[in-house]
Amino acid sequence: MDKTVPLGRVKGTLTPPCSKSYAQRALAASLLCGETSVLRNLEFCDDTRSALRCIETLGARVKHVDASTLSIEGGLHPRGKVLHVGESGLATRLFTPIASLCGMPVTIEGQGTLLRRPMHMMIDPLRRLGVRVRDNDGYLPFEVRGPIRGGEIDVDGSVSSQFITGLLLALPLSQHDTTLHVRSAVSTPYLDMTVDTAARFGVEICHNDYKEFYIEGGQRYRPAFFSIEGDWSAAAMLLVAGAVAGEVTVKNVSMLSKQADTAICTALVRARAAVINDEDSVTASHRPLRAFEFDATHCPDLFPALAALAAAAQGESVIRGTSRLEHKECNRADAIREEYAKAGIEVDTSQEDVMRIRGGRIRQARVQSHGDHRMAMSMAVAGLLCDGEMTIEGAECVAKSYPGFFEDLEKIRI
């Protein structure tokens, strides 16, 4: 599906979808609880549906109380031998350790761009925790068979924190205590979200500055009443739209959130946008924007939003952390460079771990999403400033995280 975004200004108030990162963690914790939990404020993007499908396959009984509320009776009693994670990297790395709690073989399958994303970092740690793994050269599909044991192991945290999240949620139910020695942990705010979610279900996880995690075995997940907060990754795109093309207020978000992408507000301030923070909303509005420097190592999902912000700013912006982008839905560093070049914006990624973006006039262009939801949204925001229209090929991929993005953007056009 192609989507065309013409030059225009925006003004209005929007509520983003719920945090899919929190939603998937809460769904997993509800599965691991042997009683009934209630999750509120859920909205169903593709990734959240994948997680819901996973917990049902692994034994959860789910009742839809209303359009945004689920009652979930947990318990690991697999109903099948195949766990289909869709195109969700988090669901893959989260539910593989959880499936390894079972004493039966479970095959993890995916689709689309996920089949090109490496999963090798899970294989050796799982084997050292007693899981039998039938490998596929580090890619999906593969088979795991538990039970997963505790122990003391090293885990590489330099590529992603998602597998560590899966271990942290699964290992409290193992028979033995576990110490994880984590090398070069990245995206540490996401680990904070995991520890927070576990705590809200009565499970304790301790860590030493993300270098060591201690997980006591034999714990029990307790039922929770869990309200999912708004998604800061989605909010970031909307706030950048306000900063470059008018004024946008985003509701149901708080700067006190543990979500990594609250950091977008720091970038907006550095770019000299006007930012107002209220108790449950944030507003960003346009002022003449200047080039900025920002380190996105621990919030790599912000890169596409930061690219749109930098393209609208005067001067050369410097964004660090590009090493985190290779194994997303696409190689995001390459995609940002290629697609923004079509719109006349120079993006330099020749320096290791650094992206330089020279802001300027954004030209009318026809660009590709690369099957990446955040790239599609980034180019749409840039389209608000182009000298004609920005046409995005493959725009349907926004359904992965924010199905109503283009409709919401249209609502606030003036």
Please give the residue ranges for each predicted region.
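Structural preference for solvent-exposed beta-strand-turn elements
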Residues: M1-I414
